[in-house]
Structures are given as structure tokens and as C-alpha cells.
Swiss-Prot record:
Record family assignment: Belongs to the Mo25 family.
Transmembrane segments: none
Gene3D superfamilies referenced in this protein's UniProt entry, alphabetically: Leucine-rich Repeat Variant
SUPFAM superfamilies reported in the protein's UniProt record: ARM repeat
Taxonomic source organism: Arabidopsis thaliana
Record-given protein name: MO25-like protein At2g03410
């Protein structure tokens, strides 16, 4: 085989099988209390070398690009004999470089095709407990958590995986994960959370329609009301993107018809940081643009008209944004001309 295997004696399938055997051997040696430490170290060293070789096949190295035929053989063997599960399970026992390599292998395999099929998606659909392991892994210490988020970011690109997480208890964990004290882990968790709520539009729309009350109660309370600056900013931006997506139009109308939701946005508009104010504005304008505003929403907008107009007069992004200025002018004009008489119109 050309490229990577010009001077290699082992074929991809053989390396995969040896890797799987070494993982099993490392586990059995760990269970033997009288096993010699040097023997365990030798097994782990060989395992790390194999993992490095697998990564080189998928990504290439300084001497050669990846060989499609080699990637195909590796992918086929990897999923044929369920190597993904033990590799993920072995990550805590690997050294740092091998952990990085294993993470990259799992991520890369999500994109590999066999006869135009994403075999990783098919595999995960039948082995969803692997996703449970990745989600639970984020609860590990800082260094390990980054490897699990790195793998999961690629897995949630599969619609079947995103749907499973949305409809399982796993989703609830992300309301905490996005607020973890380690910034890099929280950032990764936020990216996964965004993928779950934006990539697969039909799945998201169906989920939000069925779980509206629970989801937005959690979202409002944990992320928009009690979250840190980082959490509030990310959550308000994501919420705006979700509500303004056409596939979520029914959810958007329901959200902007709630007085409680309006109050949350008005509180965010009073945040001392302009970035949060700007994100909140993009959601607030949906309440104002609603042609069928409920009576209580019209009343609170009229009652707070002066404060809102004064706040918006000074609200500007750092860089000139014609679109923002146009939206702001429309919102301010609507609020300025709003009257309690409009309640009757809204009720028709």
C-alpha cells in the first residue's frame, strides 16, 4: 500500500485488533494485585504506540497524507468488533499524549464513510450507552473532561445522537456543565449545548414543542437569571438564535407571549455589561414585534416606556451596525406609539 504503509508491515485492521487486545490485557493486569508493575507499564507503552499509529493512519504525518484505503480498512475493523467502547473506557489509564491521540481518533471516525454510510452514526444508534459514558465523563476532573467534550462535540453532529441526548436525562446535565468552573470545559460544553439546539432543526423543533414548559423553566432559571456573566451572555445569544430560527416559529410565539419571559429580558437589558444588553435586545425586539401582544405585555411596555426608550437611546454596539440601528429604531418607534388601546386590538 502506498503512502503511510510503504515501510510498514502491519495493516490497519491488524493494528486495530492489537489495540483492542492490549486494552483488554491492560485491564486484566490491573485486576491482578500481584502483577508486576513493569509488565503493566510495558503493556501500556505498547498500547500508546498503537494508538499513535492509528492516529497517523487517520490524519497522516509529516511524511505522508492519509491514505483513503487505509482509513477505510481501519474504520471497518474499528466498528466491526466494537473497539470504540473499550478505547473510550481506557482513556483515564492512558498518558496525556495517548489521551489526545485517542480523542482525535474518536472524533475523526465520526466523519469516516464506508460505502457512503456514516458507520459511526449507525454504530452509536445501536450503542447509545457509549454516549452516556461520554456525557458522564465530563464530570471527571478538568484534564479528563476536555477529552470527553472533544469526542462528544463530533458525536452530536449525528442526528440520532443529538435526538437521544435531547430526549434523555443527559440534557439536564448540560445546564450544569456550561457553568463548570473550568473555562475551557465550560466553553466546550456550551458548544455542545449549542449544537444540540441548532444543528438538527426538525429534531429541535419537535423536542421544544413537546418539552416547552420544562426546558424553558430550566433555561430561564439556571442560565438567564442565576448564571455568571459568561453563562448569561452565551445563553442569551443561543436563545436568540433558537427563537429566530424559522423551524421554531411556534415556540417563539409562545415564548414572546409570556410576561415572565419579558421580565427576564428587561432584567437582562439592565445588566451593567453591554454585551449582555445587546444579546437581550435581539430577544426583546421579538416581544415588541409580536402583532398579537397579550394584554399584560402591552401594559408593562407602556408602563416602562420612558425607561426603555432612555436605555435604548444609549445602546450601541462597539462597531457600527446598520442592521442593529434599523431594528432599534423600529422597536423604539413601536414602543413610543404603543397605547393601552392596543390591548383591544391584541385581543381580537
Amino acid at each position: 500500500m502506498k503512502g503511510l504503509f510503504k515501510n510498514k508491515s502491519r495493516l490497519p485492521g491488524e493494528i486495530v485488533r492489537q489495540t483492542r487486545d492490549l486494552i483488554a490485557l491492560a485491564e486484566s493486569e490491573e485486576e491482578e494485585t500481584d502483577a508486576r508493575n513493569s509488565k503493566r507499564l510495558g503493556i501500556c507503552a505498547e498500547l500508546c504506540r498503537n494508538i499513535r499509529d492509528l492516529k497517523s493512519i487517520l490524519y497522516g504525518n509529516g511524511e505522508a497524507e492519509p491514505v483513503p484505503e487505509a482509513c477505510l480498512l481501519l474504520t471497518q475493523e474499528f466498528f466491526r468488533a466494537d473497539t470504540l467502547r473499550p478505547l473510550i473506557k481506557s482513556i483515564p489509564k492512558l498518558d496525556l499524549e495517548a489521551r489526545k491521540d485517542a480523542t482525535q481518533i474518536v472524533a475523526n471516525l465520526q466523519k469516516q464513510q464506508v460505502e457512503f454510510r456514516l458507520v459511526a452514526s449507525e454504530y452509536l444508534e445501536s450503542n447509545l450507552d457509549v454516549i452516556d459514558s461520554l456525557v458522564e465523563g465530563i464530570d471527571h476532573d478538568h484534564e479528563l473532561a476536555l477529552h470527553y467534550t472533544g469526542m462528544l462535540k463530533e458525536c452530536v453532529r449525528h442526528q440520532v445522537v443529538a435526538k437521544y441526548i435531547l430526549e434523555s436525562k443527559n440534557l439536564e446535565k448540560f445546564f450544569d456543565y456550561v457553568q463548570l468552573p473550568y473555562f475551557d470545559v465550560a466553553t466546550d460544553a456550551s458548544k455542545i449545548f449549542r449544537e444540540l439546539l441548532t444543528r438538527h432543526k426538525s429534531t429541535v423543533a419537535e423536542y421544544l414543542a413537546k418539552n416547552y414548559e420544562w426546558f424553558f423553566a430550566e433555561y430561564n432559571t439556571k442560565l438567564l437569571e442565576k448564571g455568571s456573566y459568561f453563562t448569561k451572555r452565551q445563553a442569551s445569544k443561543l436563545l436568540g438564535d433558537v427563537l429566530m430560527d424559522r423551524s421554531n416559529s411556534g415556540v417563539m410565539v409562545k415564548y414572546v407571549s409570556s410576561l415572565d419571559n419579558l421580565r427576564i429580558m428587561m432584567n437582562l437589558l439592565r445588566e451593567p455589561t453591554k454585551n449582555i444588553q445587546l444579546e437581550a435586545f435581539h430577544i426583546f425586539k421579538l416581544f415588541v414585534a409580536n402583532e398579537n401582544k397579550p394584554e399584560d405585555i402591552v401594559a408593562i411596555l407602556v408602563a416602562n416606556r420612558t425607561k426603555i426608550l432612555r436605555l435604548f437611546a444609549d445602546l450601541k454596539p462597539e462597531k457600527e451596525d446598520v442592521g442593529f440601528e434599523t431594528d432599534k429604531a423600529l422597536v423604539m418607534n413601536e414602543i413610543a406609539t404603543l397605547s393601552l388601546l392596543d390591548i383591544k386590538t391584541a385581543d381580537r
